[in-house]
Amino acid sequence: MTAAILADALTQKVHQTEIDKELQALKEQAMVSGTEDSILVNKRQGAADLLGSLRLPHKRDEEWQFTDLSELKAIDFVAAGKVSLDVAAAENFYLPEAHQSRLVFINGFFTPELSNTNDLPSAITCQSWTNLAAHQREQLANYLGQKTDGNEVFSNLNTAGMTDSAVVWIPANTELKSPIHLLFLTVVDPTPIMVQPRLLVVVENNAQVTIAESYGAISTNCTDRPQQQPYFNNIVSEIYLGENAQVTHIRNQRDSGDSFHIATTAIAQGKQSRYRLIDVNLGAKLSRHNLQMTQQEEATKTEFLALTILAGRQVSDTHSTIALNHPHGATNQLHKCIVDEYAQAVFSGKVLVPQAAQLTNAQQLNRNLVLSSKARINTKPELQITADNVKCSHGATISQLEADEVFYLRSRGLNDYDARHLLIDAFAGEILDQIPLASLQGRLRQCVSCRTI
């Protein structure tokens, strides 16, 4: 072995040790709070044991090669504690469409005084895990922690510290007209805190529901801008659709501009089910969304629509995997990014179409609008196909505002600022127009106008 190879091996060994220590510190903080729930105790222990063989990601890892976690690793986070919050502060995040169908979690803890589920039929369960009856927890136990990637370190970190979860359980043959709002707020603290929200959604056969999942921060300044105290939001959401179930899922992330937001969303679809995700990502210094869909039976339809808007030195990374394991599946993924200043957007999307998935129709497109010469885009749409009777396509575009389009609008009387904003709003509008909740769509449109140019 040459001296150079030996030195490199020693460097990697030292680095591995450092990573293990950092993960161990996060694990210890995650497990500060205990639970007497036997179901959670068993799941926590399994994840904690698994963490012993895992490490935090590094840029040498292919799945993390464009996303540097050095800043997150350098901060000594402590487990978030319970805090009180004035109703007025939380009301800014409420959705009028879900006035009486809302669960609120502050720093990861269920807050019943800010929640309201009076509008929901008695057959529907919308509650925190700890407030469920024992027989309900037993019925849901097999869903909890089953669909996340078993070797993914951050989802295991969440499970190792799990003391509660938001739970939405829609029984068979139930169509819920009003949306359910799941609101997760972080109160910015002088000490860097780690928050680990959890969400479990079970929609049984022939049931329908719309769910809005929101993340935000309570602070004195515009929370999706920097100059806030850092915190770490580590989230796991698991969503199960029975046969012919339909779920519309609106997810919006507006964490503080100096925070870290890492989320795993795992979806399992039954026969002829329909799942639609509209994902809007605006906040956090560094955000990562691991999105996984598993087709459990045939003839499913899946739609992922996403909009990410970045400025400053923000980094946002979306990794999605759509596993089509049965025939007659249909997927459509449109991921759009608007990137300004020194920001960086990363997209890696895999669509897996094995031999069993005949007659699949899978479409994937990543479109990026770059507003600065210093902004960076890393994109990798990917199809892995072995089935021979399918209709699949994928692609990516990276563009700037077209000078001739700006000139045309200016020739119609708009100034340069308004012309550019009109084009940016139109680019974002393709996603925002799909949000079925008028109040949320309006707020996010205001954010787009505030964040661009």
UniProtKB/Swiss-Prot annotation:
Matching SUPFAM superfamilies: Stabilizer of iron transporter SufD (SSF101960)
GO biological process, alphabetically ordered: iron-sulfur cluster assembly
Matches recorded under InterPro entries: Fe-S_cluster_assembly_SufBD, SUF_FeS_clus_asmbl_SufBD_core, SUF_FeS_clus_asmbl_SufBD_sf, SUF_FeS_clus_asmbl_SufD, SufBD_N
UniProt superkingdom: Bacteria
Pfam families to which the protein is assigned, alphabetical: SUFBD_core, SufBD_N
Family, as annotated: Belongs to the iron-sulfur cluster assembly SufBD family.
Designated name of the protein: Iron-sulfur cluster assembly SufBD family protein slr0076
Source organism per UniProt: Synechocystis sp. (strain ATCC 27184 / PCC 6803 / Kazusa)
Upper taxonomic lineage: Bacteria, Bacillati, Cyanobacteriota, Cyanophyceae, Synechococcales
